[in-house]
């Protein structure tokens, strides 16, 4: 589950920190993890007209359910900060692809709603949609890089132990 260990990393400077708040094994065998992340405020200054949006970072809460038997990861996240103005929600599911279990089938949906800011709210929604869509693709690329690095480390450790055993 590279997803649960990938942030922060050197590939995405917008993730400032990520702290595990809770981790437990549920009765169905799933591992439940709740994290809070601090993410850089990427809103352009033009869209930061409201005082509560003039912050360095936002906090997001993420909940994950990892079923190792089914190889299924479900992720739900929402914003904790500025929630009186903006509601951001995202849900993702990672499962083995039906035609090749070595591939991952990835589904994601999300919403951004801005409350009570009129045309400024509409501009924030449009910006957020574009930024988050690009961010989802960027997150996939980061995950692939981290998985490749992890595989290289595992292979090199195994190989060096084999040579020097």
What is the predicted role of each segment?
Residues 1-43:
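Hydrophobic ligand-binding cavity/cleft-lining segments
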Residues 34-51, 55-56, 60-63:
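Eukaryotic helix-linker segments that join adjacent hydrophobic helices
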Residues 11-12, 23-27, 48-56, 66-165:
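Terminal "cap-and-tail" regions of soluble proteins that handle hydrophobic small molecules
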């Amino acid at each position: 589950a590279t997803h649960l260990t990938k942030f922060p990393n050197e590939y995405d400077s917008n993730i400032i920190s990520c702290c595990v708040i809770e981790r437990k094994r549920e009765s169905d065998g799933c591992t439940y993890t709740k994290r809070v992340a601090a993410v850089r405020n990427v809103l352009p200054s033009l869209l930061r007209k409201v005082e509560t949006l003039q912050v360095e970072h936002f906090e997001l809460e993420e909940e994950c359910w990892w079923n190792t038997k089914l190889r299924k990861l479900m992720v739900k996240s929402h914003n904790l900060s500025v929630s009186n103005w903006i509601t951001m929600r995202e849900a993702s599911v990672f499962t083995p692809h039906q035609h090749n279990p070595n591939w991952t089938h990835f589904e994601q949906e999300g919403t951004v709603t801005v409350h009570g800011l009129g045309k400024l709210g509409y501009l924030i929604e449009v910006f957020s949609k574009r930024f988050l869509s690009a961010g989802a693709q960027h997150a996939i690329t980061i995950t692939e890089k981290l998985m490749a690095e992890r595989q290289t480390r595992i292979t090199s450790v195994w190989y060096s132990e084999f040579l020097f055993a």
